[in-house]
Structures are given as C-alpha cells and as structure tokens.
Amino acid sequence: NVEVTATSAGKSATGEEVTMLVISIDGGTLVNGGSYRTLACNEVVDAATVQNGMYEVVWSDTQSAVTPESGQLGALLELRDGTGEDGEYKGVVYYINQLDEYARTLAEAFNEGTASYSGHADGYDSDGDTGICFFSYDGVDSATLKKNSGGYNAITAANISLSYEVQTGVANIAASSSADTTETDNNENILALIDLCDSDEVFGDCSLADYLTSMTATLGTAASYATTQSERHDEILCSVNTR
C-alpha cells in the first residue's frame, strides 16, 4: 500500500519539465514535493499481548499507527506480527503463541493430571503432603498459582518455572501415590507422570514431543518456502534489469 504519484509542477528556468512526487503509505502522505513527514517507533506496553515490548510504527506528528501491507517494511512487520489466522503469515507472534500454549498445557497437565493419569498435585511428598504443583510461573507457590484469577493462563513460555515448593526442596516432589510416609519406595506417581508425558492425552491428539515436532516442521516448511520465493524474485529482478 505504498503509492507514488508523479504530477507536473511546471517548468524550470531552463525550460525543463519539473515533476513533483507524492508518496503515500497506508493512506497517509509521506512526501509531497519538497515537504515530508517522518515515521517513529514506539514501544508497545501491553502485558496482555505477545506484542508487549515490541515496537509499532507510527506517524511522528499524530502518533497514529502505520500498517504498511507491502514493501520491505510491510514484509518485516508481517514476519514479526503474523498470527497465522485467517490466512495470515505465520510470523514470530504465531510461534510465540504456540510456545505459550505448549507451556500452559504442559504445566496444567503435569500439575493436575488427565483423564487417565494422575498429576503432581494428586501425589504425596515425603511428608505426606499433597496438592503441590510442580510447575508454576515466576517461581510463585502452588496457592498463588491456583488463586490467580487467570490460573494457568498466566503461564507463558517466558515465565514458566518450577513452583516455589519444588524449587526450595526436592522433598516436596510428590513421588508417592500414598500419604503413608513409611512407603519410602513408593514412586508410583512419578511413573504415572512419565507415562503422562508420553501419552496423547496432554494435547488431546498428540504428546508433548509430537507437538514440538509438528511446530518445528511447520517452521521448517515456512522457511523453505520463503527461501524459494526470495530466490525466484531475485531471478525475475535480474532478468528485468538485464533486458
């Protein structure tokens, strides 16, 4: 959506035709003859979105957003912001969302269990205590994780962590399936957690490893397609320039 319009501005003192260029981006005028506007980059501050900490392009004078759909700038923004939804390119934001979903699903399934497998919170630690989460975010304890209104939605790939209890003592790992502290060799809950990670119940149709494999394959396919398209465009440009 970059538009360039050339109009006649009369003739110079020597009689030569003078052309005035008007260049527009996203419907706004960037250059109009001898005058011009500038663009700026503002940091996005919105903790509720994955764009938090990234930069948006705006008009310097009005601070309104610029969303070019073509050209090098448009391509770079698409590469970064593409969500993969409604035919959009699968950009950085898409893969951040995929990793966030992986982290949340892993944490919830490992902590709470699934239909066929018990979770860490279902097991018992060496003192016979139960209800302890293995994963959390930013190192908070199990109570804080469950009390948070967002619950597991607060977990991202960037902030997933071991819970405070597990970080502060391996004795808090719920290895046993029984509250009986005399069963020192009971590791049934740990074995169930291992089986859970290999099962298809975590994501409903694939295991944790399968999910990552699928995401990596998607990224590889996209990279290969982009490389092929770039080479093809270079060949076309070279052909045009040599005519």
Where in this protein do the model-derived segments appear?
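Structural signature of extracellular appendage/secretion-system components
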Residues: 1-243
